[in-house]
Amino acid sequence: MLILVLVAGLSLISIHLPLGRDEGVAAYFGWQILQGKVVYKDLYHFNLPGIFWTYALALKLFGLKPEAVNLFDLCFRLFTLIGIYLAAARLFGRRSALWGSAIYGLFSTVVYNSYWQNAQKETFALGASAWCLYFFALGLGKERLRNFWFMLAGICGCGAMLYKPTVALAPGLLGLYLLLGNRLKIKARLLGVTGLAAGFLIPAAALIGYLQSQGALSEMVRQVFIFGTAYGGQYYSGGLKVLGLMLWKISDWTMAQGFLVAGAVLGLWGLVKEKDPNWKPAFWFGLGLFLNILVQNKYFTYHFMVLVLPGSIFAGAFLGRVMPRLFSGSARLMRAAVWITVLFLMGANLKPDFGRYGRELLYDLGKISKDDFLEKYGKWGFGDISVTAQYKVARYLKEQTAPEDKVLVFGLEPGINFMASRSAPGKFTYDLPLTYQFGSEKLKTYQARLKKEFLRELGAAPPVYIVVVEKDTSTIEPRDSYEQMLEFVEFKNFLAQNYYLETKIEHYYLYRRK
């Protein structure tokens, strides 16, 4: 209970965090879903829909504002924490579970409940993954309703996949462990794998049926498997450079989270030494989550969030079970020194991220203005967005337009549409599918079709404003959106013929319809 209160309290301090770019996209999609739009059919995106439906639920429950997302993120983190506690308790006992859930609560909140890290796809995939591991552990240990527990594990595994497809490697390795291991008799193993697979297929079939009923299934296939795979494929180009990046990023994260990694390794070592068979499902599950990072080959901070789950469970087993046995015969002073060292190392890992709470508290208490608070978030020229500039643009658009008016933001920031409460004129709410410069000839042909569809939408329902962003380059967009607009000749001509430059707010050109 204490760790739940601590996690909730720290999270509430951060309740006013602004939306990062990814969160802005998901917030806009969630709002549009509440307006009756269907992902893929009415809203173009190459991700699976779990994150957008989750944001829609958050906005429905708590209102159309960033705080709604942060509050839902808090609730979901508590849900995940409970799942981790139950899974760890089932595998390694209550004492280990208490330590594991405490470690998860602190690291997931202090490190990952911050600007641009919170409410990511990984956040919600973690919750489903934790409960997947718990139900799988129940199936291993309980003969009664065994196949039902495995089926629930499969359902949760598919739920995690709806946020992040590669996370499915974790329940997949659990299935292999169940099939090839010797924990159960062969008949029980086969039935268990069947239950796991059936559970996985139930929500997958429901998703396919829903999208087909909405006329969005074929569009989902095109957006996710044509554009999405081409977009993801860019991260594999570069030969040895890719391998070097992988090793560097993993090493950097390992050093930054040294307490978590060292605790997990020591916990795993102790459990193997004790010949506790339950280390195996937890290890294979954690390996699947690690392979998920390698397969997608992306290494932003939030991509490593999934490793906090197995890391916390094994580190909790070390503190709650392995370490007390190691030092059971030691003098009291020795045990105290060990615990002081553990707490010091944990504090050293968390200290860099604790610094933000002071500023957040000042804003919560009304001691600094909103503009001063937002100024910290985002810096031009670092592949980032300026939150302050976004709010200025959104405020201006809201003042100059009616609620029913349409606004197109030609960039990567439909979060401006969300903040201004102004819908985009069509399904293309950000420019990446139209301007992405890598990929095969097949992708280029597909892109040409998208551009024609984009221009048809603009011609049929021209927005009151078109906002074009400059200097928004990043690792995924090496050229800024303004330059890409100039190279998109048909769009540039449409803009010149039908719009005039009304004003410029920082790096945002605001063109108004003539």
Task: Please provide the spans of the model-predicted regions.
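Short helix- or helix-capping micro-motifs
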Residues: 7, 100-109, 157, 161, ...
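Extracytoplasmic
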Residues: 47, 165-167, 214, 339-514
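Transmembrane-helix motifs of polytopic, lipid-linked glycan transferases
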Residues: 71-95, 99, 106, 131
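Hydrophobic, aromatic-rich transmembrane alpha-helices
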Residues: 82, 249-277, 282-283, 287, ...
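Specific aromatic-rich, kink-prone transmembrane helix
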Residues: 124-142, 149-152, 156-157, 311-314
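Membrane-interface alpha helices of multi-pass inner-membrane proteins
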Residues: 148-165, 170-178, 198, 202, ...
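Hydrophobic/aromatic-rich transmembrane helices and adjacent perimembrane loops
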Residues: 169-170, 290-292, 296-332
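Perimembrane helix-loop-helix junctions
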Residues: 170-201, 268-275, 313, 319-329
